[in-house]
Amino acid sequence: MRAGHALVLFSGGQDSTTCLAWALTQFAHVETIGFDYGQRHHVELQARQTVLAAIRSRFAQWRERLGADHMIDLSVLGRISDTALTRDSAIQLSAAGLPNTFVPGRNLLFFNLAAAVGYRRGLHTLVGGMCETDFSGYPDCRDDSLKALQVAVSLGLGQRFTFETPLMWLDKAATWELARSLGGQALVELIVRDSHTCYHGVRGVLHAWGHGCGTCPACVLRQTGYDRWQARPVAAP
């Protein structure tokens, strides 16, 4: 068990749910923070509450460690962004070579605001589900970006903050395996049934890997990782 308390950037998706479970195994007290930034679908905001309630009810070993949840109104980001996550537009590559699901400044703002909350509540470890292995090239998911931001936040607030990114060098198959190692099949089932990833907000169809349209980049990445994880040989006991 590590010293100190942690604040998890928690969206209700697969990655942030896995990171929340990771934090609950590492720290004696963990709080969560989410952001309403004007995303097209509020399904993920509903999934946040479902996942948090499920963790409290199904995982006795984590129940007492899971503290307050903080929801931040960041709707201004949606108003100034013109992306497929904040507008009703088709997903495609932009002229810069990035998918138009990239919301400029999103993770930078998330960490800055999380640090402001953490400063007030004595939560100096911030945990995020960013990843360089299976990702869409978002510059604010890169390890270098987050390390630079960690330094800037620590200097700007006059306190030492640590940004933890447990998934940074894992592919999606390894993320599924990490979830299993943290919470067993119960956590895998929670992620499948209760977390949300689909860019189109589809919840009516439950696949082996979870709810979703099955065709958007987020669903394809999640399904591919799940299939690869399932195809891996089981280690001998």
From Swiss-Prot:
Signal sequence coordinates: none
GO biological process entries: queuosine biosynthetic process
EC code(s) of this entry: 6.3.4.20
EC class of the enzyme, as a word: ligase
InterPro entries, per database record: QueC, Rossmann-like_a/b/a_fold
Required co-factors: Zn(2+)
Top-level taxonomic group: Bacteria
Amino-acid positions noted as binding Zn(2+) in the UniProt annotation, renumbered to this chain: 198, 213, 216, 219
Binding of ATP, residues: 10-20
Cofactor note: Binds 1 zinc ion per subunit.
Reactions the enzyme catalyzes: 7-carboxy-7-deazaguanine + NH4(+) + ATP = 7-cyano-7-deazaguanine + ADP + phosphate + H2O + H(+)
HAMAP family linked: QueC
Protein name as annotated: 7-cyano-7-deazaguanine synthase
Organism listed in the record: Verminephrobacter eiseniae (strain EF01-2)
